[in-house]
Amino acid sequence: MLYSLLYGYFNINLFQYLTFRAGLGFFIAFFLTLFLMPKFILWAKAKKANQPISSFVPSHQNKKDTPTMGGIVFVFATIVASVLCASLGNLYVLLGLIVLVGFSFVGFRDDYTKINQQSNAGMSAKMKFGMLFILSLIVSVLLSLKGLDTFLYAPFLKNPLFEMPTMLAVGFWVLVFLSTSNAVNLTDGLDGLASVPSIFTLLSLSIFVYVAGNAEFSKYLLYPKVIDVGELFVVSLALVGSLFGFLWYNCNPASVFMGDSGSLALGGFIAYNAIVSHNEILLVLMGSIFVIETLSVILQVGSYKTRKKRLFLMAPIHHHFEQKGWAENKVIVRFWIISMLSNLVALLSLKVR
């Protein structure tokens, strides 16, 4: 809106620069989240919209009165900042906002069910998976119709591994959406554990998106160019800004949880950025914490079903370390460090290829 008004009509050249608009979007989203979150917390407490805590985690029972669904606030702040600072005529921006809103809506349905039933189970896995699948399929098909190329790239290699047939690419993108959104959802079990790795991952992906959308940088760095995708940089930075605002209230001890309303939206948007910037494989490194958490659950379930034995004291793995006597803050900060280092290595692939 500001972009169209100040640059389109008044020709204020400052607004033609992605970096300026992305920075402005960051601060708008940050301060809007800071402003709205206390009001949301008061409202949620009045409505008793508290996070049901599993009986299997007795050390977390003191968190049972903490309100959830804080993700609604940072998703809303991101949308406002994006509408103000990004070009809404850009399809990559519109699809990114659809991903944020759509995945957040599925998460909201799940959170609402948990609160109503006072159960940690939420809506049925079949319903949740079905809604996420339909959303992922729609966005993947639209990306294909947009003309996003279907080459599969590996980190540190300048040439693609191969070109996927359209149907295979769409199926692969759906898998990336589903796996990433659920991985972030599984990680969201301790104060700040999902938000900070999401910030690191989004910052890395936003750099890749910016490079992919810039003809000079992509040519110099031998990176695949994606026409018009650079505008998504504005939305990504807005989401990072809103996450910093959310972290202000989510750091230990948390005053609010993001809930599935936030974690599914984050996972979906991270996946979207990885797909449009051709970083589906590199996402495994950038989202290392999400991968580790998900693998711990898969291994735990698989081991118990096949051998009737558990590999970990509890899954996801952050609870395993808690059971071993690690303080919650120690688990959180160490996971943050792993995430930060993983993303620094991932960024090296921009130059080393």
From Swiss-Prot:
Pfam families (UniProt xref): Glycos_transf_4, MraY_sig1
Major localisation: membrane
EC number assigned by the record: 2.7.8.13
GO CC aspect terms: plasma membrane
PROSITE patterns found in the cross-reference section: MRAY_1, MRAY_2
Keywords assigned by UniProt, alphabetized: Cell cycle, Cell division, Cell inner membrane, Cell membrane, Cell shape, Cell wall biogenesis/degradation, Magnesium, Membrane, Metal-binding, Peptidoglycan synthesis, Transferase, Transmembrane, Transmembrane helix
Cofactor (UniProt): Mg(2+)
Transmembrane segments: 24-44, 66-86, 88-108, 129-149, 160-180, 192-212, 229-249, 256-276, 281-301, 330-350
GO molecular function, one term: UDP-N-acetylmuramoyl-L-alanyl-D-glutamyl-meso-2,6-diaminopimelyl-D-alanyl-D-alanine:undecaprenyl-phosphate transferase activity
Location(s), subcellular: Cell inner membrane
Domain of life where this protein originates: Bacteria
Pathway, per record: Cell wall biogenesis; peptidoglycan biosynthesis
Catalyses which reaction(s): UDP-N-acetyl-alpha-D-muramoyl-L-alanyl-gamma-D-glutamyl-meso-2,6-diaminopimeloyl-D-alanyl-D-alanine + di-trans,octa-cis-undecaprenyl phosphate = di-trans,octa-cis-undecaprenyl diphospho-N-acetyl-alpha-D-muramoyl-L-alanyl-D-glutamyl-meso-2,6-diaminopimeloyl-D-alanyl-D-alanine + UMP
Topology within the bilayer: Multi-pass membrane protein
GO terms of biological process kind: cell division; cell wall macromolecule biosynthetic process; cell wall organization; peptidoglycan biosynthetic process; regulation of cell shape
Protein family according to the UniProt entry: Belongs to the glycosyltransferase 4 family. MraY subfamily.
Role: Catalyzes the initial step of the lipid cycle reactions in the biosynthesis of the cell wall peptidoglycan: transfers peptidoglycan precursor phospho-MurNAc-pentapeptide from UDP-MurNAc-pentapeptide onto the lipid carrier undecaprenyl phosphate, yielding undecaprenyl-pyrophosphoryl-MurNAc-pentapeptide, known as lipid I.
Protein name per the record: Phospho-N-acetylmuramoyl-pentapeptide-transferase
Species in which this protein is naturally found: Helicobacter pylori (strain ATCC 700392 / 26695)
